[in-house]
From Swiss-Prot:
<keyword id="KW-0274">FAD</keyword>
<dbReference type="InterPro" id="IPR036318">
    <property type="entry name" value="FAD-bd_PCMH-like_sf"/>
</dbReference>
<comment type="pathway">
    <text>Secondary metabolite biosynthesis; terpenoid biosynthesis.</text>
</comment>
<dbReference type="InterPro" id="IPR050416">
    <property type="entry name" value="FAD-linked_Oxidoreductase"/>
</dbReference>
<dbReference type="InterPro" id="IPR016166">
    <property type="entry name" value="FAD-bd_PCMH"/>
</dbReference>
<dbReference type="Pfam" id="PF01565">
    <property type="entry name" value="FAD_binding_4"/>
</dbReference>
<comment type="similarity">
    <text>Belongs to the oxygen-dependent FAD-linked oxidoreductase family.</text>
</comment>
<dbReference type="GO" id="GO:0016114">
    <property type="term" value="P:terpenoid biosynthetic process"/>
</dbReference>
<dbReference type="InterPro" id="IPR016169">
    <property type="entry name" value="FAD-bd_PCMH_sub2"/>
</dbReference>
<comment type="function">
    <text>FAD-dependent monooxygenase; part of the gene cluster that mediates the biosynthesis of various drimane-type sesquiterpene esters, compounds that exhibit diverse biological activities and are widely present in eukaryotes. The pathway begins with the synthesis of the backbone drimenol by the terpene cyclase drtB using farnesyl pyrophosphate (FPP) as substrate.</text>
</comment>
<dbReference type="GO" id="GO:0071949">
    <property type="term" value="F:FAD binding"/>
</dbReference>
<protein>
    <recommendedName>
        <fullName>FAD-dependent monooxygenase drtC</fullName>
        <ecNumber>1.-.-.-</ecNumber>
    </recommendedName>
</protein>
<keyword id="KW-0285">Flavoprotein</keyword>
<feature type="domain" description="FAD-binding PCMH-type">
    <location>
        <begin position="77"/>
        <end position="252"/>
    </location>
</feature>
<dbReference type="InterPro" id="IPR006094">
    <property type="entry name" value="Oxid_FAD_bind_N"/>
</dbReference>
<dbReference type="GO" id="GO:0016491">
    <property type="term" value="F:oxidoreductase activity"/>
</dbReference>
<keyword id="KW-0560">Oxidoreductase</keyword>
């Protein structure tokens, strides 16, 4: 049974929060592709098979096709594409793009781009009746001691990156959940355990190798194509296909961290302490945490918990003193490697139905506590109406201080705009369930929770326009919260590097700059 290993453990909090740290419906079942009307795009796959990547094109019935489809994080996001392409080089990606954007194919060959397949939004990393460009074989991790940088492929997974770098005794800013892919994480921003010290993960990128919509291979750095370089840091899939990230390396140390669980009666204390921690994060930027509430059917236990991280091997650092004073139920905190942390009780959520939805608000304990109360109402409603099967709900609140933005500005900054409008708290609300018939229960209720919490924050003048792109659901609009100047920079870069709008229209999935009205730009 899915989740059984994690939930039978006394340290269930580990598996729960790991899902909350990923840096995100409905799905057509993975059966006969004829159901999806794939005949309309058959010529797209034929043209690809006749190109230089012909031996890397796979369709329904091929083992590679099913292997790729079964590797998506959520059953809801694996769709019946007409074929998938598994490029092994930037040149292969160029061939795919030049083939699919030919004038006689462009209007009938929609395609999706997949790095790790960890998006929870249907159609963002796969496509029904189209072509999926699967970057999973571009998964290299190469350390360059002469430049103190690491080359990363977009199809890598962060746990593999960390493992491959261990012999070199270096580290990079990366994901906190082992199965998250490199590509989407970095182009969406990337919250890491080092963010209070180094900014978002994208701020540690020193160059991008990019294939443009017309197949051109270019490099973007602070000196070469600087507008593209800047806007790729938060621009998601609006600009091109990144085939290599060159990122800064720094000395690897063990870290202190783990998961501590509490009775939900501690909710007011946890909310106040999270507000205080966020307000004082500059006093010790080596410390970071997430506070969350969770319920699962296998234990039938409702609990609160913290995931705490300290980026030096210091036992019980003073930055968390307020938390030590709160009575806990269990704890796994100890000094360990980052691989140990990101794989602790690695969950097995593949083929569960999954949703992510997010909200940000100003750092205020009242809003945090109200969010925890709304989560409890959500749990009660699900219990009363669910058809059956196992399910899990998580409401995770984490600091998003201005420090995440100002620290990154030392390396050129990004277009996300965290340095604006004060310290924030980001909520990632997640639900995992088994049965298709419960889609119409879990999803609308989650959206309602977000709307209700947003209204409450607004009533206290604690609301925020910001939404973290890597946590957002498909109906949300994270790019519109970047701020007017940043939005305009991204719009200009998209028009310059993709003048035909391939990544706006021919790639239907993803958050599009073209869908952000000019009127929504805010300084």
């Amino acid at each position: 049974m899915l989740f059984a290993k994690a939930f039978q453990s006394a340290t269930v909090a580990g598996a729960v929060i790991l899902a909350a740290l990923v840096d995100v419906a409905h799905s057509t079942p993975l059966d006969d592709p004829g159901q999806c009307g794939l005949e309309a795009v058959a010529q797209c796959c034929t043209s690809l098979r006749e190109s230089a990547v012909g031996d890397k094109v796979f369709a329904y019935g091929d083992i590679e096709y099913f292997r790729a489809k079964r590797s998506y994080y959520s059953v809801t996001t694996s769709l019946n594409s007409a074929c998938i392409v598994l490029p092994e080089s930037a040149e292969d990606v160029s061939t795919v793009l030049t083939t699919l954007t030919q004038p006689d194919l462009a209007e009938t060959c929609p395609f999706a781009i997949r790095s790790g397949g960890h998006s929870m939004v249907v159609g963002f990393s796969d496509i029904a009746a189209g072509v999926t460009l699967d970057l999973s074989k571009l998964n290299h991790t190469i350390y360059h001691p002469e430049t103190e940088t690491v080359s990363l492929g977009p199809g890598g997974r962060w746990v593999n990156v960390y493992e491959e770098l261990r012999p070199d005794n270096v580290m990079v800013s990366g994901g906190r959940f082992s199965s998250v892919g490199v590509g989407g994480f970095l182009t969406g921003g990337g919250i890491t355990i080092y963010s209070a010290q180094r900014g978002l993960a994208c701020d540690d990128v020193v160059s991008f190798d990019v294939v443009l919509a017309n197949g051109t291979l270019i490099q973007a750095t602070n000196a070469t194509n600087p507008d593209l370089f800047h806007t790729l840091k938060g621009g998601s899939g609006n600009l091109g296909v990144v085939t290599n990230f060159e990122v800064r390396a720094f000395p690897q140390t063990q870290i202190w961290g783990g998961y501590t669980s509490y009775n939900v009666s501690k909710t007011p204390e946890l909310a106040r302490t999270l507000q205080n921690f966020t307000s004082n994060i500059e006093q010790d930027p080596k410390a970071l945490l997430v506070t969350f509430w969770t319920y699962d059917t296998l234990t039938d236990v409702n609990r609160a918990a913290n995931a705490m991280y300290y980026t030096d091997p210091v036992e019980y650092p003073e930055a968390f003193n307020d938390y030590y004073a709160i009575e806990n139920i269990s704890s796994t905190v100890h000094t360990r490697s980052i691989e140990s942390l990101v794989t602790e009780l690695e969950d097995t959520t593949n083929w569960f139905r999954v949703l992510f939805v997010t909200l940000a608000f100003k750092n205020d304990a009242r809003v945090i506590e109200h969010g925890a109360n709304l989560y409890q109402e959500y749990i009660d409603t699900i219990k009363a109406n669910v058809s059956g099967g196992d399910w899990l709900v998580i409401a995770g609140f984490q600091p998003m201080p201005t420090l995440f933005g100002t620290s990154g500005q030392e390396n050129g900054g990004n277009i996300i705009g965290l340095e604006n409008n004060g310290d924030k708290i980001v909520l990632l609300f997640e639900a995992f369930w088994e049965r298709t018939q419960d889609d119409e229960l879990f999803e609308p209720l989650a959206d309602e929770l977000i709307h209700n919490l947003e209204e409450y924050a607004r009533s206290l003048e604690q609301d925020s326009d910001f939404l973290y792109l890597n946590y957002a659901d498909g109906w949300q609009d994270p790019i519109s919260g970047y701020g007017g100047d940043n939005i305009e920079q991204l719009r200009a870069a998209a028009e310059k590097y993709d003048p035909n709008g391939v990544f706006q229209t021919q790639v239907p999935g993803g958050f599009k700059i073209s869908k952000v009205p000019v009127a929504e730009q805010k300084k």
